[in-house]
Amino acid sequence: MAAPGTPPPLAPETAGADSGGGSGEHRQLPELIRLKRNGGHLSEADIRNFVHALMDGRAQDTQIGAMLMAIRLQGMDLEETSVLTQALAESGQQLEWPKAWHQQLVDKHSTGGVGDKVSLVLAPALAACGCKVPMISGRSLGHTGGTLDKLESIPGFSVTQSPEQMLQILEEVGCCIVGQSEKLVPADGILYAARDVTATVDSVPLITASILSKKAVEGLSTLVVDVKFGGAAVFPDQEKARELAKMLVRVGMGLGLQVAAALTAMDNPLGRNVGHTLEVEEALLCLDGAGPPDLRDLVIRLGGAILWLSGQAETQDQGAARVAAALDDGSALHRFQLMLSAQGVDPGLARALCSGSPTQRRQLLPHARKQEELLSPADGIVECVRALPLACVLHELGAGRSRAGQPIRPGVGAELLVDVGQWLSRGTPWLRVHLDGPALSSQQRRTLLGALVLSDRAPFKAPSPFAELVLPPTTP
């Protein structure tokens, strides 16, 4: 996939000189692994050879794991990361859309968080603003939730759509949210599965290549990546998250993509609900023009940046105002209803979900068999509700999966009954857990109580999770 701004291929003699010797002939995989293990530079030919080995089965699982660990420990420079991204993108099918759509084709991606249901709200809101959003999303793995699993908690919703079906949905609705097929970026699928079991997830070049290779095949003009940092994020440190953000922007430019990266805090859950069905309910509240302020704020900010960068708004503020209007006037909710119907949900159910009250919606979606409330152990101001321990307990209860393909319980989750910054009296309920199995164990209760952090300072308004926006060097 030749893209504007991509560095020219290295000549064989240059590649050999930069990479620690050798000629233009393909190196064997053990030699490539040794080179990167020792901190060497992989040439374009080296990287493409490795990706070809993934695809034709020459690379053994042990060799894949060894190469990933070498990259994790030694890193990759901009050129190596760009070539890896491009090689992964070229390993499968490219999606093609009408040329007249190019400026409208946009997307958003998140590095993963707890309670992160932004995509469910943002995709239809952008469609209501005239965008085309061919969102290829993922499933939950570990403590982070997956957009596909949330949508599949809605009876009938199908995340499997052919390119032809995606084209039709984009024409009629303006957005679709689908899963990654075996034909789209298959080499990334191999690396993604291996990274999860080899402790190589938290690598800037590997994350960059994985995200951007999937987005490159979507044929986008503009992408905003929500890079999480904090206690429940891949990178707890904001500076490391900023490093990833800058790499995403620079590699995206080489692919001809207009990429910006938002740094957003992930210490507390986003919104008040965590768990697949509960997050769908909260997304519908936001699409009603209501919902928790932190969720609405993030949707509006990310959407405003996308409209501005794609040339569909003159400023970020103007773009944000358009997204807010789509939430408030019902047009985003209508697009969500159309998307549900287009992706397999019975039109009557889609209509009932989008027009019903919160109580009615809960009856239409899968829900857990019982609920337990936790009481505050002391008086104080809610300083923080740690997202990671909360997510880990919900994972144990069946809301998450430890391996790909493992079934989940869509109704399992938790509702926060308090907001960060508010006063909480001893004995007051602060968390409602929805569960299917036995009652919470004493250890699970201790873990959840440890997630609640109280202080003695004055009540305060919780800050927005949005920290900063990393932009390409030249912006509209």
Curated annotation (Swiss-Prot):
This is Thymidine phosphorylase. Pfam families: Glycos_trans_3N, Glycos_transf_3, PYNP_C. It comes from the Eukaryota. The gene is Tymp. One of its GO terms (molecular function) is protein homodimerization activity. Pathway: Pyrimidine metabolism; dTMP biosynthesis via salvage pathway; dTMP from thymine: step 1/2. GO terms for biological process: dTMP catabolic process; mitochondrial genome maintenance; pyrimidine nucleobase metabolic process; pyrimidine nucleoside metabolic process; regulation of gastric motility; regulation of myelination; regulation of transmission of nerve impulse. Belongs to the thymidine/pyrimidine-nucleoside phosphorylase family. It comes from Rattus norvegicus (Rat). Its EC number is 2.4.2.4. It is an enzyme of class 2 (transferase). The modification Phosphothreonine is found at T6, T475. It catalyses: thymidine + phosphate = 2-deoxy-alpha-D-ribose 1-phosphate + thymine. PANTHER family: THYMIDINE PHOSPHORYLASE. Residues 1-26 are annotated as: Disordered. Disulfide bonds: none annotated. Keywords: Glycosyltransferase, Phosphoprotein, Transferase. Homodimer. Catalyzes the reversible phosphorolysis of thymidine. The produced molecules are then utilized as carbon and energy sources or in the rescue of pyrimidine bases for nucleotide synthesis.
